[in-house]
Amino acid sequence: MQIPNTFNINAKANIYLPIHSEEALVEALQQHKNPFVLGGGSNMLLTQDITQPVLHILLKGISIVKENNDNVWIKAQAGENWHQFVQYTLSQGYGGLENLSLIYGNVGTTPVQNIGAYGVEIKDVMESCEAINIHTLQKRNFTNAECSFGYRESIFKGKEKGNYIITAVTFKLTKRNHLLHTEYGAIQQLLAERGLSSPTPKQLSEVIISIRQSKLPNPDTLGNCGSFFKNPIISKTNYEELKIQYPDIPSYSIDETQVKVPAGWLIDRAGLKGYRKGDAGVHNLQALVLVNYGKATGKEILAVAHYVQATVLKQFGITLEFEVNIF
């Protein structure tokens, strides 16, 4: 069968096993070694058929672990749709996940990538996650600190890569005195247009959704996996040198010696926004997004990605790293 993926790549699985419980997961791991673990299919590019057994993690359920007057600790099973979960928490009046609205994928993969948007990352809101060791079948609880979070990085992409399958994630959210992140220009502008000087988490989420919908394609209608490249982090010295030639190059300060530069701006300035080769290309509104216009193969999209990398490196001397996982 075709492996579900938001790039809409026609890649097939020899063995496909939908997993709806931890018991089913353990049983599948006893029978199938070296599995291919599938979540929401939203952060990967398939360049070939998958010969390994595909375990599709579909565990469902949302529950409150504990709460007090200020906070609530809420657990979501790995197969819960991320955006739907975010909207559920907002409907309950909880704050913390609003900036992460309309990110495609499932709950279980969010700690792996340490997903982030508009100044908020999973590391800022995750309390812990539960995972099963693929080799020993033992269950383990990882605290936030034990996940070794970095920019689009975690222990699950580093030291423990391929060793664990996340089954549930617990988030610490606010019930009052919400700390809202509205520092991005587009957010401030839209809040002002809507007359929202003190927005609720739900109102901020609606603004974020509006911004994302205005520039990001819906994978249901145009195959993509959101941001394909990481925003590169460069030295301030390098940035100041680039600023001489490109005075309008934007940046976000990381620390005293480093800044983050938007990859989308670099790709756009390199003249690649809207670039297309066959059915693979760079989106015409958001250069950070690669798209499948119809029947592109994973290899064709990867070729476009490599072309983008080479062009940006030649023009700016900056190497763009992939945010997506390539298989």
Explain the meaning of each model-derived region.
Residues V304, A310-T311, L320-F322:
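Transmembrane alpha-helices
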Residues M1-H135:
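Anion-binding (especially nucleotide phosphate/pyrophosphate-binding) glycine-rich loop
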Residues T89, V312, F316:
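Hydrophobic pocket-lining residues that define ligand/cofactor binding sites across diverse proteins
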Residues I3-I9, K139-L290, K295-K299, Q315-F327:
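Phosphate/pyrophosphate- and phosphate-bearing ligand-binding catalytic cores of soluble enzymes
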Residues V86, A263, Q309:
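Generic structural marker for isolated residues within well-ordered, non-membrane alpha-helices
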Residues A28-H32, E183-I187, V304-V308:
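Short amphipathic alpha-helices in soluble, non-transmembrane regions
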